[in-house]
Amino acid sequence: MVNTILVPVAVAIVSVLVGGCAGYSIRKNKWETQAQNAAHDAKHILADAESKAKAVEADLASQKEAMKKAAADAKKEKILEAQEEIHHYRERVDNELNERRQEVSRQENRLLQREDAIDHKDSLLDQKDSQLTQKENQIKKLQAQVLEKENRADQLVTEREKKLYEVAELNQEDAKKIVLDKLSDQLVKERAEMIEESNQLAKAKADHFARKVIVDAIQSSAADTVSEKTVSVVNLPSDDMKGRIIGREGRNIRSFEALTGVDVIIDDTPDVVVLSGFDPIRREIAKRALERLIKDGRIHPARIEEMVDRARKEVNDDIYEAGESALMELGIHKMHPELVKILGRLKYRTSYGQNVLSHSIEVGKLTGVMAAELGLDEKIAVRAGLLHDIGKSIDHEIEGSHVEIGVELARKYHEPDLVVNAIAAHHDDVPKLSFIAELVVAADTISSARPGARSESLENYIRRLEQLETIAKGHIGVKQAYAIQAGREIRVMVEPDKISDARTTILAHDIRNQIEQDMEYPGNIKVTVIREKRAVAIAK
């Protein structure tokens, strides 16, 4: 029973063992096969990974090389840009340095010119000082000579007294009287000579100082010149605008002329309209109004009236601003507003081609500089110089001369008495009550009589020169006469056999008087009479 049971059990165990061994062997073979396959796959994967790694390394190397090249190119480009920028900067610096060198050179030249001018003036002053010193030394020598002569005269008196006692047997009183009379006559003559020489020396000093004051005043001022005219020209965009300016049946041009008080001249001149009138303020108002009408394009009586009113207001504002600018330029304060406005009107007033406002400003500057040199009231002097021709602003509207009108305006607006007298006396109509009035006359003469300050038409100019020469030639003994200095001087050549030296002075005064009676002219005319006698002998 037991054996029966054990046999199957043993068989089962053996079967299990044999099956386990066989299964193990089969599994082992399978595992080895899988291991070989895995090793083979691993080799392939490793080979692929190595090839990919090499490719990546090569790619990285190429990228690195490209980056190095790009960096080098960028660096090179930046270096080029930097070099170019440095080049441009260097050029700018060189240009600035050249400009500064040129400016420094110009300033050095100006300084050298000023130094030369100053040295020239110093040399002139030194010469004048040396001349004055020589004159003083001469006077001292003359005084010493006079003293010596007085001592000699005393000796002569004593000697002559003795001789008179011996020869004429005169008493002492009679002899003394004779000697003293002769000595007195001699001393009077010598004293007169000394006084004359002292007067000439004093006059030379005064002339030198006066010239210095006037030259300093002239150098401190400069004024523009203008040309006198009675017409204004307005440019048109086209000739078609002329018909619109005239208007239907001429109503536009009649309205414009009635409102402005000027004549509108429309002729064949292309693209131009001429405004004619003696009053420059009206002409300026008309010009501005017409220019605005042309620009606006709407031209009819109502629009014309509006534009004329606007232009009149603008011109009045400009007039007041011109007066204020003149006061600011000269440093004048506290003037009546109405007088400022009247002063500004001089901007549109000319006299012999010279703008009266510019002339008045120049006279104010000159008067102020000369007053300062002489220690006078500079502010009053400047004020008097500026207002000396104030009457010319309205002399065509009010009856009377510009001097009378100016005096009336100055009194009306409470100007100082010195200013009123300077205005009244600047043409010698009334006596001058102060040195400031004299300075105003001098400054007015400098400003108006200097060459180029005033002008006149060519026909009047030639006629005036011919009249000057005719007047001079009409006198007996005159050989030839020449008008020079733009008619501001007439030089008269006389026949020495008919006119003596003493007679030349009388002839100059006669010609001057006839010029003053027969001619009208700006400024002054100098009459110079020249008498020359030549003696010729030929040696053979």
UniProtKB/Swiss-Prot annotation:
<dbReference type="Pfam" id="PF00013">
    <property type="entry name" value="KH_1"/>
</dbReference>
<protein>
    <recommendedName>
        <fullName>Ribonuclease Y</fullName>
        <ecNumber>3.1.-.-</ecNumber>
    </recommendedName>
</protein>
<dbReference type="InterPro" id="IPR004088">
    <property type="entry name" value="KH_dom_type_1"/>
</dbReference>
<dbReference type="InterPro" id="IPR006675">
    <property type="entry name" value="HDIG_dom"/>
</dbReference>
<dbReference type="GO" id="GO:0006402">
    <property type="term" value="P:mRNA catabolic process"/>
</dbReference>
<keyword id="KW-1133">Transmembrane helix</keyword>
<keyword id="KW-0472">Membrane</keyword>
<feature type="domain" description="KH">
    <location>
        <begin position="230"/>
        <end position="293"/>
    </location>
</feature>
<comment type="similarity">
    <text>Belongs to the RNase Y family.</text>
</comment>
<keyword id="KW-0694">RNA-binding</keyword>
<keyword id="KW-0378">Hydrolase</keyword>
<keyword id="KW-1003">Cell membrane</keyword>
<feature type="domain" description="HD">
    <location>
        <begin position="356"/>
        <end position="449"/>
    </location>
</feature>
<comment type="function">
    <text>Endoribonuclease that initiates mRNA decay.</text>
</comment>
<dbReference type="Pfam" id="PF12072">
    <property type="entry name" value="RNase_Y_N"/>
</dbReference>
<feature type="transmembrane region" description="Helical">
    <location>
        <begin position="4"/>
        <end position="24"/>
    </location>
</feature>
<dbReference type="GO" id="GO:0005886">
    <property type="term" value="C:plasma membrane"/>
</dbReference>
<dbReference type="Pfam" id="PF01966">
    <property type="entry name" value="HD"/>
</dbReference>
<keyword id="KW-0812">Transmembrane</keyword>
<dbReference type="InterPro" id="IPR003607">
    <property type="entry name" value="HD/PDEase_dom"/>
</dbReference>
<dbReference type="GO" id="GO:0004521">
    <property type="term" value="F:RNA endonuclease activity"/>
</dbReference>
<dbReference type="InterPro" id="IPR036612">
    <property type="entry name" value="KH_dom_type_1_sf"/>
</dbReference>
<keyword id="KW-0540">Nuclease</keyword>
<dbReference type="InterPro" id="IPR022711">
    <property type="entry name" value="RNase_Y_N"/>
</dbReference>
<dbReference type="InterPro" id="IPR017705">
    <property type="entry name" value="Ribonuclease_Y"/>
</dbReference>
<dbReference type="GO" id="GO:0003723">
    <property type="term" value="F:RNA binding"/>
</dbReference>
<dbReference type="InterPro" id="IPR004087">
    <property type="entry name" value="KH_dom"/>
</dbReference>
<keyword id="KW-0255">Endonuclease</keyword>
<dbReference type="InterPro" id="IPR006674">
    <property type="entry name" value="HD_domain"/>
</dbReference>
